[in-house]
């Protein structure tokens, strides 16, 4: 039987989601737990596939993974979470077709990037973001180059301000490596007056204009959701979600205390503004 899981994680202490030999990753932790519980012996024979990889420090709320198992009764979020570290949580599961591929069958993916600070002209960012909508060659917004197809369809960009935080939501059919972080970097440059909309238009025409762009930091990025043409029959695990909320609250308390500690190390006026 093939099972899909929705996974959330705090990516700060992981070298990305995809398994690596010597570094801690989200998949590495999942593989260990699934094997320990007798749910999956080997990711290759179980045809383990994720909806996509996230880079070092990037977080997720709606990562989707799928695998074959002879023990679907054990492949439940609350069972899996009992062995996972306190920064990774399965929170929903679904029985899916044998050929279900979370990556290839995805209709779209949604990311959220969170910025801190009021130094941006939000009206400029909103105006510039409209240029990115639709089908474009995003070569200038990707770390990888070459013959790989680089045309993507951006379906939605929403920008909201809450206090000192700016949230940028981006939905596309799929994303190139570092594409979201480079889009955010470009919008930050326009919003701060370093660049203008004309430059952004040139960036969308890589055949005539090419420029390297440093991506925004990974710690502000969250994979929010993955959408499929035929909605999956997700079963949310209420107990797993409650326990995850408790752990998230613990992290919030720790980070809030740490923020105050940092504000007293070589304090400045800007330190007080961050709290």
Curated annotation (Swiss-Prot):
* Catalytic activity line of the entry: uridine(38/39/40) in tRNA = pseudouridine(38/39/40) in tRNA
Sequence similarity? Belongs to the tRNA pseudouridine synthase TruA family.
Query: What InterPro entries does the entry give?
Result: PsdUridine_synth_cat_dom_sf, PsdUridine_synth_TruA, PsdUridine_synth_TruA_a/b_dom, PsdUridine_synth_TruA_C, TruA/RsuA/RluB/E/F_N
Recorded hits in PANTHER family, A to Z, give: PSEUDOURIDYLATE SYNTHASE (PTHR11142), TRNA PSEUDOURIDINE SYNTHASE-LIKE 1 (PTHR11142:SF0)
What are its E.C. numbers?
5.4.99.12
- Highest taxon in the source lineage: Archaea
Q: What does this protein do?
A: Formation of pseudouridine at positions 38, 39 and 40 in the anticodon stem and loop of transfer RNAs.
The protein's matches in Pfam families, at most eight in alphabetical order, are given as: PseudoU_synth_1 (PF01416)
Keywords of the record, alphabetical order, are: Isomerase, tRNA processing
Q: Which residues hold substrate?
A: 111
Residues passing through the membrane, by range: none
- Put simply, this protein is called tRNA pseudouridine synthase A
Identify the species of origin: Methanococcoides burtonii (strain DSM 6242 / NBRC 107633 / OCM 468 / ACE-M)
> Active site located where?
55
Q: Entry's NCBIfam families?
A: hisT_truA (TIGR00071)
Q: Does the keyword Protein biosynthesis apply?
A: no
Q: What is the lineage of its organism?
A: Archaea, Methanobacteriati, Methanobacteriota, Stenosarchaea group, Methanomicrobia
Q: Which GO terms describe its biological process?
A: tRNA pseudouridine synthesis
Q: Which GO terms describe its molecular function?
A: RNA binding; tRNA pseudouridine(38-40) synthase activity
């Amino acid at each position: 039987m093939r099972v899909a899981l929705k996974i959330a994680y705090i990516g700060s202490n992981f070298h990305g989601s995809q398994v690596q030999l010597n570094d801690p990753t989200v998949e590495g932790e999942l593989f260990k737990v699934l094997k320990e519980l007798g749910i999956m012996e080997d990711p290759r024979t179980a045809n383990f596939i994720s909806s996509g990889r996230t880079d070092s420090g990037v977080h997720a709320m709606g990562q989707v993974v799928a695998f074959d198992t002879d023990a679907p009764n054990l492949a439940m979020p609350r069972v899996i979470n009992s062995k996972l570290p306190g920064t990774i949580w399965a929170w929903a599961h679904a029985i899916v077709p044998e050929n279900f591929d979370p990556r290839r069958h995805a209709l779209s993916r949604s990311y959220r990037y969170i910025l801190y600070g009021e130094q941006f002209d939000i009206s400029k960012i909103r105006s510039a973001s409209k240029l990115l909508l639709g089908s474009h060659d995003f070569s200038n917004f990707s770390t990888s180059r070459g013959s790989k197809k680089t045309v993507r369809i951006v379906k939605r960009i929403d920008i909201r301000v809450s206090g000192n935080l700016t949230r940028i939501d981006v939905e596309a059919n799929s994303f190139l490596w570092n594409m979201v972080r480079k889009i955010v970097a470009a919008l930050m440059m326009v919003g701060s007056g370093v660049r203008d909309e004309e430059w952004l238009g040139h960036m969308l025409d890589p055949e005539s204009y090419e420029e390297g762009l440093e991506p925004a930091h990974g710690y502000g990025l969250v994979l929010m959701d993955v959408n499929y043409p035929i909605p999956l029959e997700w079963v949310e695990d209420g107990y797993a979600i409650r326990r995850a909320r408790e752990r998230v609250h613990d992290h919030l308390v720790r980070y809030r205390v740490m923020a105050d500690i940092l504000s007293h190390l070589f304090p400045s006026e800007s330190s007080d503004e961050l709290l």
